[in-house]
């Protein structure tokens, strides 16, 4: 990493020039933690908040919001997105982008940030808002606990038990399994499940679930295989939904540095670069291509 003072000076120059492409390039070079150090260095050097100066320099829109998010406390950004998705609106897509696309470490910090910002415990506030009548709500509560323990049986035995749960529509078992299985054990269980049933766990969801119940578990499947795989799926959803800039802001702003391999996982759906350029306008697309390092 170059000297912090030089990076801060480069950022100030880009802001003064209203050069959002250069701001995006600088952001793309560093992790979320490093970007926070840059924001602190900017504060120390100029006595101003970096996101505020980005806001003053640029011309609004999701592009401005995304670049501001990249130099803000990501845990506070996630907490705010969750709060915005609640408030009686229950934006299910936002829950996939913020609750499931999140590492356990980041979730712990987000919970603390939410309480600090809104004076309420996050999980309790979430469940109060969405209720407990639907399967996806109960699954989300288990997922947000981030309590995973090694499975007792072999992959083949666990696959047998899971298949039995599907045949009996045992929603509690299925949701507890998905919320509690360690990621490092999930892949082998999924492989055994395929050998046993002829389909993957993700395909089995479609046999008994629809709507948000289905998509919550489907997203969890990808998250357990690797956050970059979930990011690829969510980016594809955002592209297919008429270029959903709000979703791309959430996915990119909070997780791009942890999910850069998404562009490789995306090959299942096609070319991430081609889809981004096709689905987003001439202002947003180059920023997204820079941040995701889509150069092929």
UniProtKB/Swiss-Prot annotation:
Gene3D superfamilies according to UniProt: Annexin (1.10.220.10)
PROSITE patterns attached to this UniProt entry: ANNEXIN_2
GO terms of biological process kind: cytoskeleton organization
Keywords, comma-separated and alphabetical: Annexin, Cytoplasm, Cytoskeleton, Microtubule, Repeat
Source organism superkingdom: Eukaryota
Subcellular location(s) of the protein: Cytoplasm, Cytoskeleton
Signal peptide start and end residues: none
GO cellular component entries: cytoplasm; microtubule; plasma membrane
GO function term, MF aspect, one: calcium-dependent phospholipid binding
Annexin repeats mapped onto the chain: 2-71, 73-143, 153-223, 226-293
Family: Belongs to the annexin family. Giardin subunit alpha subfamily.
UniProt function note: Giardins are involved in parasite attachment to the intestinal mucosa and in the cytoskeletal disassembly and reassembly that marks the transition from infectious trophozoite to transmissible cyst. They may interact with other cytoskeletal proteins such as microtubules in the microribbons or crossbridges, to maintain the integrity of the ventral disk.
Protein name per the record: Giardin subunit alpha-2
Species of provenance: Giardia intestinalis
